Structures are given as C-alpha cells and as structure tokens.
Amino acid sequence: MRVRITPSRAEGCAVAPPSKSMAHRLLICAALSEGESLVEGISCSEDMGATLDCLSALGASYTREGNAVRVRGFDPRMSNPKTPLLPRESGSTLRFLIPVAWLSGNETTFRGAPTLMRRPMDIYQVLCREKGMTFSKNGCEITVKGGLPSGEYCVAGNVSSQFISGLMFALPLTDGESIIRIMPPVESRSYLELTRAALSAFGVRVEWENDLTLRIAGGQSYRARRVTVEGDYSNAAFLDAFNYVGGKVTVTGLSEGSLQGDRVYRRYFEALSGGTPTLDIGDCPDLGPILFALAAAGRGATFTGTRRLRIKESDRVLAMETELKKFGTELEVSEDSVTVIPTAFHVPSEPLCGHNDHRIVMSMAVLCSITGGVIEGAEAIAKSFPDFFEKTEALGIKAEKTNEF
C-alpha cells in the first residue's frame, strides 16, 4: 500500500489501541487455563491473529465477540499438533510458545516469515542441549520436542526478555520448583513485569528472589478469568507525537499505573522538545523509531541502548538512517548508540520505504504531516495498529491511500 500524506495538523481526541504486549500474554494465560476465559480488548492485528492461530493449533479454541475473544483452554502436556504452527512475523508468538510446546513430549513445528526466522533463537537452542530436548531449524521452520523439566535455567538478559517470559509461562506447569537465573545486563525488565502481572491475573505466581533470579513453584494451574487489555503506550506514542510537530491531540485509554516500559515516552518527548538530550532506550526499544523521528524534526539527540533495534522486524537503526537521510538528517551510529544530527529538515527527496516494519511506517507518517511525502509499503501497520491511518485521518491528517505496492 502506498500512502501520500500532505502537510496537515492533527487535532482532536484519540483512544489508544489495546496493548499488543499485554494481549499476547493474556491470551496465552487464557489458553493455558482450564475452562473458558474472556479477554476483552483484542485488536484485529496480524500479531494477535498469529497468537490466536498458534494457540488453536496447540489445542485451545476461541471465538471472537466484537473486540473480545472467548478462549477455551487446553492441556499443553497433551498437545500434539499435526500441522505447523504459523507465527507469521510475531517474535512474541514464537518465543512465548516454544516453551509451551516443550511441555508435551510430542514434536511441534513452527513455520514463520523469513524476517522472523532471522531473529536470534540461540538461547532456546542452548537450553535444549542442556535439558535433553530437541531444537532444529531448517529455513523458515523450527521443530522442537520436549518434555520440559523443572530445574534451574540460566538465560542471558541482553538478547530478548521474550525468552525468559516464555519459560515463565511454561515452568509453573512442570512438577517441581524451577529457578531462572538471568545473566546481566538485564534489558527490557519491564516486559518481565508485564508477564508476571498476566500470570498473576490467572492465579499463577512467579517471584523475584533477587534482581537476577526468578523462583517458580511447580504444580501450579491457570484459572480461567475475565480480563481486559489495557491501552498500549508504545502505539499511543505515535498519536501523541503529533503534539510535538504542531498538533493538539489528546490520547485516552491509557492506565497511569501501567507496568509498560514504553510509558516513559511522554518524559522522553518532553526532553526532546527542550534540548538535545541523551536518552537510554534499552528498556523501551520499540520507541526508537519515533524518538529518532522527533529528534530529526527538532534539535537532535543521542540515544543509548540501541543495539537490539537491529534485530526487530527490520534493522531499525539502518532503516531509520536510510529514511531520515531523505529528510536531510544524518545519523552517527555505533554499536549501542545513535546520534541524530538535524540539518536542513526538508520534504523527503524521494518516496519513503516502510521496510516491512509497522513502527517505521508510523514514524514516517508523523514526519510527513510536517513536510508531506509518500510512504511505500505502508501496509506493514497491519502488524500492530491496522487502523492507524483511519485514526490519524479522523484527527485531520490528510492521507491518500492506494493499493500500489
């Protein structure tokens, strides 16, 4: 999809979409519960479809009721899927559900998009060798076989918290006590707190023994619940960003007591509007693209903790460097930091590329509201925020969509 945006000012009120991070977690907990749960606030995004499809293939069942999903749970120890699970491009779906698949002694195959299967999976490969399980990768397929034992697990904390969260879902269902030791440095700790909150909502306890150790009692069971997904700070940031490029937008539907690490975006936006700050995004890497974009339109900034942006849906550092250059902005890039150096910010010199990355597309849309411009590959927003352009058009952003690719 190609979108042509003309310079326009956003004004009005917008409701934040449901939190993708929390929705994944609550759906998995519901599927692991005995009986029927209702999860309210589920979008029709690609990532939500991926998690629901994979849970269904493992043995759960679900029905959509408007923006809610009714889930009937299954026993993962009895799971024996006959066809590959399809996580599409969702890293959360794949990494959360591999340990769930390990709970049975049966073989499970995941078949994902090439961009997903290029993302690191070494942590699970190592754990399989250590625990006597199997893990094989062949092109776009990963095949695993358990069963998952209780015990001690050592996991690197600086690759992705998703590996740790995956174990947190599965280990409470094993027979004995387990310990997860996290090797520092620990990044994205806030995502582990989201996992703990989701588990707690369904009656499962995972406790911090210290800053680097999680203790998990075995023999626990998930209890069916009715829960509501809170608003998504990471996607709300793209709506709120219009306030920093001349707009006047009120974003509602966010919980002030949220555990989401991306809630820091408001403080970071204020810092960008007041100078040329140095900001650490190690605990909120999904904010990287929009922060780079606002820095380019403003006075610049330096961002640390950027290493993991290279292993997202795209290499987000390279993607933003490429696209911001079209606006006249240079990036100084090192292994774990990015400095945005604004020069003569101008109308993009050529069409912008979405890099098959929803957050790149939405960041470019915010900038194009200032300068105008064309974004190619804008369909990538379907991954997390399929109605993004409908929401921004309701705010007054002038966007013309065509089905050209």
Residue ranges of model-derived segments:
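Short, structured segments at the rim of ligand-binding sites
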Residues: 1-405
